[in-house]
Curated annotation (Swiss-Prot):
Record-given protein name: Neurotoxin Cex7
Keyword Signal set for record: yes
GO molecular function, one term: toxin activity
Family: Belongs to the long (4 C-C) scorpion toxin superfamily. Sodium channel inhibitor family. Beta subfamily.
Taxonomic lineage of the native organism: Eukaryota, Metazoa, Ecdysozoa, Arthropoda, Chelicerata
Signal sequence interval, chain numbering: 1
Limits of the LCN-type CS-alpha/beta domain: 2-67
Annotated Gene Ontology cellular component terms: extracellular region
Residues recorded with modification Cysteine amide: 66
Subcellular location per the Swiss-Prot or TrEMBL entry: Secreted
Organism: Centruroides exilicauda (Bark scorpion)
Keyword Nuclease: no
Length: 69
């Protein structure tokens, strides 16, 4: 299993969050069927996810820089 920042496949951006530490929104995103993670929390204003399957991409996605040129 791996861990990392959840990333939007369409934009390459991290999932933002503002409530640091235990975060219901991040935990929900992390455990969503398309992510398949075990536990999510808010770290440095982005959702960090643990126990992800190898197939789930994490930030950064090569070639996608989240709106930066």
């Amino acid at each position: 299993a791996r861990e990392g920042y959840l990333v939007s496949k369409s934009t390459g951006c991290k999932y933002e969050c503002f409530w640091l530490g235990k975060n219901e929104g991040c935990d929900k995103e992390c455990k969503a069927p398309n992510q398949g993670g075990g536990y999510g929390y808010c770290h440095a204003f982005a959702c960090w996810c643990e126990n992800l399957p190898e197939s789930t991409p994490t930030y950064p996605i090569p070639g996608k820089s989240c709106g930066k040129k």
